[in-house]
């Protein structure tokens, strides 16, 4: 039986009078790789930002191992440290080296000693192929390399779940493959991942489940085979038809 990590119940989010998420329900089990697809403005990124508490939901519940992390008195900082996020724009510290970027959070948030944090950072920088660049600063490396560092930084925090917010959309086309390759390796290693993406081949080939969002709601979800080969709703078919040659 799969181990339930996250359960989202009736989640809604409004900015002023504009509701961007409406009554969202879904679950995340250990080892799940869930791709969230949909047109721009459908609420995908806002959903991830709510899960990471970068945005506060207007209503609903986010249960982490059965505990509602939106309830007053819950240690949200501890929760955030267990749910990592990789951003479209990398969000690296430009005044730090690659290695320092991957060490800083471990020391400040997890209270690791620098030697342990350094060794842990190197483990993941080697895994993403960035060990030769540990003394470089973000301005000295390519976009694809920055995103690989961002993934290593997130993994060095030992998250239980990793959220990816369109991790390849800011990259030049020739750099997309190197980042997707790292993400495939993570998925195959058993990392629990939620990925907002426009990379349909990745969603189809790597995901355990695909969620299609439109207008702030989950319109349809299922296995990649179900969603890509036999979508049940016309709006899902219309969206996917844009990606078929």
Locate predicted features.
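C-terminal boundary and immediately downstream tail of ABC-type ATPase nucleotide-binding domains
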Residues: 221, 225-245
